[in-house]
């Protein structure tokens, strides 16, 4: 009754939102930078958020440059302003505003967060909502950006603000083939279900870095899908408010906090995408109604999802994901993305576990050279390939990709 659980969460979240709630609550927090960031960001929201019923939730987090007066001057039919007198960080600003508002802080069915250094573009919110409403299991969606990480970057040609908006307007055409399910998301901007936000919005053990990774893992383990919308572009100004030394310190501490919380899972190495490996394994000449895909030692399964996304993008059919891993710490996350079997056993049990099963694609997550008997492993993989099936992996860490096909 998982779907019933989704519906009950939505119903509970909507109990205290008052009459005629908006579809989306757009949240924007600012601390100074009125002229070089805030005005541009707000004007972009007002100009480019069309055909979506939204409220504007504005938080002035202790600014001293006239930000509050600017917020008051904004014309929008559904606008709420919160003024935090002293800046103690972005999280405190959010919590202070939330505490002042009570149960009606987030009124929309969906919650969109826009950082002050992000400029939205034409149809950004309409496109994200379209993706979100395509499946009740989708919990969070994010757009592409010019400056981001984890394969969420899209490069558009422009040299001025106007050119950027024109290029983005041409680019932002909703296309389900460009929606990619991910293990984790980097939210330059984001749209999430308010029901999830109200249930779990942050682990305060993370100061800055890895808080988003934690959010991704939590929502996915609750049964929700995380979607990257490659069909939508927003502009993210490069840079960080932290000093380089403080940033690197927070990276190290956040990464270790994440490892401890998730019993050894590393948010970087265990969710790594290998685009070259997936594309060299894929056979674009052979569409199938259902592609059976097995990942061996694929950690949390990022490459399994990426392969599934590639098949979708090229109209090569659906995908049923299965996995075999030797380390138990990956089992839970693989179960969140695999509709097929997930085996967690020593490698010596691989052949017995796969008995009677064949796959159209087999992806090897670890370098072949790291196995004690690479030849025996390749023979097992070959024996469990369907006729015309393919298997691929890397010979060594960051070495060449090998791809083999079974003809008979």
What do these predicted regions represent?
Residues 43-53, 312-313:
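Short, acidic, metal-binding catalytic loop of nucleotide-sugar glycosyltransferases
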Residues 119-157:
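Conserved donor NDP-sugar-binding/catalytic core segment of glycosyltransferases
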Residues 119, 182-189, 198-235:
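Donor nucleotide-sugar recognition loop
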Residues 1-22, 170-172, 247-289:
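Non-catalytic membrane-proximal stalk/linker segments that position and tether the catalytic domains
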Residues 84-105:
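Glycine-rich, basic loop-to-helix element that forms the pyrophosphate-binding segment
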Residues 169-192:
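A recurrent flexible, glycine/aromatic-enriched loop bordering the glycosyltransferase active site
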């Amino acid at each position: 009754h998982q779907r019933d659980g989704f519906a009950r969460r939505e119903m509970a979240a909507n109990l205290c939102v008052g009459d005629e709630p908006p579809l989306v609550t757009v949240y924007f927090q600012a601390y100074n930078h009125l002229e070089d960031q805030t005005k541009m960001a707000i004007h972009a929201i007002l100009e480019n958020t069309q055909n979506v019923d939204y409220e504007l939730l504005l938080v002035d987090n202790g600014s001293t440059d006239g930000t509050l007066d600017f917020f008051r001057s904004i014309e929008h039919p559904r606008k709420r302003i919160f003024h935090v007198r002293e800046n103690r960080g972005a999280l405190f600003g959010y919590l202070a505003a939330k505490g002042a508002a009570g149960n009606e802080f987030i009124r929309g069915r969906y919650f969109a967060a826009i950082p002050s250094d992000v400029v939205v573009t034409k149809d950004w919110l309409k496109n994200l909502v379209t993706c979100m409403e395509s499946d009740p299991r989708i919990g969070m969606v994010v757009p592409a950006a010019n400056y981001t990480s984890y394969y969420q970057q899209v490069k558009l040609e422009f040299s001025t603000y106007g050119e950027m908006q024109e290029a983005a307007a041409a680019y932002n055409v909703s296309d389900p083939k460009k929606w990619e399910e991910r293990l984790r998301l980097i939210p330059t901007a984001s749209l999430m279900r308010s029901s999830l936000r109200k249930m779990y919005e942050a682990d305060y053990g993370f100061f800055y870095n890895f808080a988003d990774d934690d959010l991704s893992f939590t929502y996915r383990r609750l049964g929700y899908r995380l979607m990257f919308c490659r069909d939508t572009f927003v502009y993210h100004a490069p840079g960080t408010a932290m000093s380089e030394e403080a940033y690197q310190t927070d990276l190290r501490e956040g990464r270790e906090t994440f490892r401890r919380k998730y019993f050894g899972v590393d948010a970087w190495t265990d969710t790594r995408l290998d685009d070259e490996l997936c594309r060299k394994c894929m056979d674009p000449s052979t569409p199938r109604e259902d592609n059976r895909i097995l990942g061996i030692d694929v950690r949390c399964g990022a490459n399994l999802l990426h392969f599934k996304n590639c098949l979708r993008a090229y109209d090569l059919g659906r995908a049923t994901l299965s996995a075999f891993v030797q380390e138990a710490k990956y089992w839970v996350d693989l179960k969140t993305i695999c509709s097929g079997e997930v085996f967690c056993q020593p490698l010596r049990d691989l052949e017995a576990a796969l008995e009677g099963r064949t796959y159209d694609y087999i992806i090897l997550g670890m370098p072949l050279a790291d196995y004690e008997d690479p030849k025996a492993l390749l023979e097992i993989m070959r024996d469990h390939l369907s006729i015309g099936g393919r298997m691929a992996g890397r010979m060594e860490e960051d070495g060449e990709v090998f791809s083999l096909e079974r003809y008979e």
